[in-house]
Design a protein with these regions (language model features):
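Short coil/linker segments at helix-helix boundaries
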Residues: 48, 52-60, 84-119, 126-163, ...
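Bacterial N-terminal signal peptides that target proteins for export
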Residues: 2-13
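N-terminal leader/linker segments that initiate helical-solenoid repeat arrays
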Residues: 23-66, 70, 76-90
Length: 270
């Protein structure tokens, strides 16, 4: 092959390569194959729900949490969060029937969470928080029946995490409520359930003081301790603690209601 033929051959090859490159440049890059995103989606949904939860936007939080539940129905912490939203909606509900319905929804999710996570303090406490919130809307029989689950829930949560201030708070309220049980309710409960436990306001005080020591930033601890002192006739201590709690910024969904109860207690002290 002479030099002229070689040059022509090289030119042909070069032209062919350039043509292929031009065609390749006109073809858009293929879309990357998407990776499975279930776990990422769940995490994103929970983060979105948590953001709404911090703002006490229960309906918006539920939208994200319930969507996440469809992907991870056995996520105990997620079920705890869902139960909390139904309790928050209880606070905003305007009828007893709606409050009870929402409370029952919260109970269902709380029980599921506790069953799935026997070693998780928050999962165990969810039952006690929910039952305690429902007491105001229940009759004597239901209130008596709820006493045991509330106590066991708080005890389990504290055993798993001694620094769970909410658990100490719930236990304090339990002691105060049991100490206040009158003769008729106690007799009624004993006839149906054999016996009712006994407790004292002093035991309640110890629990609320523990909650304050762990987390002094929550007004409900101070107000409920003050209300307990009011039950004990310690008016100065009651005024001091309730007044302190009323001056603190809200940190929990039920703080406005708790503060109103504190104001009512203060009024009765004067």
């Amino acid at each position: 092959m002479n030099s002229s033929s070689s040059i022509k051959s090289l030119s042909a090859v070069a032209a062919l390569l350039l043509g292929c490159l031009a065609i390749r440049a006109q073809i858009p890059d293929a879309e990357p194959v998407p990776k499975p995103v279930d776990s990422v989606t769940v995490a994103d949904l929970i983060l979105k729900g948590d953001a709404c939860d911090r703002k006490f936007k229960a309906n918006e939080a539920l939208q994200s949490y319930l969507a996440a539940e469809k992907l991870e129905p056995k996520n105990a912490r997620l079920l705890v969060s869902i139960a909390r939203q139904y309790r928050h909606l209880m606070t905003d509900a305007t009828t007893r029937e709606k409050k009870v319905m929402l409370g029952n929804m919260a109970v269902g999710y709380s029980l599921r969470a506790a069953a799935l996570a026997p070693n998780d303090s928050e999962a165990q406490l969810a039952i006690g928080i929910t039952y305690a919130k429902m007491l105001l809307f229940q009759g004597t029989k239901e209130q008596v029946a709820a006493s045991g689950p509330i106590k066991r829930s708080a005890d389990a949560a504290i055993r798993l995490d001694p620094r769970n201030d909410t658990a100490w708070h719930i236990l304090g309220r339990w002691h105060r409520n049991v100490a206040a049980v009158g003769g008729v309710k106690r007799v009624f409960g004993s006839l149906i359930y054999g016996s009712l436990p006994k407790s004292t306001n002093e035991a309640a005080v110890a629990c609320f003081e523990k909650a304050i020591a762990i987390n002094p930033q929550r007004p409900m601890h101070h107000i409920e301790l003050g209300r307990t002192y009011a039950e004990m006739g310690k008016k100065d201590d009651a005024r001091r603690l309730i007044t302190k709690g009323l001056a603190m910024p809200d940190t929990d969904k039920d703080d406005p209601q708790t503060k109103q109860q504190g104001r009512e207690t203060l009024t009765k002290l004067h």
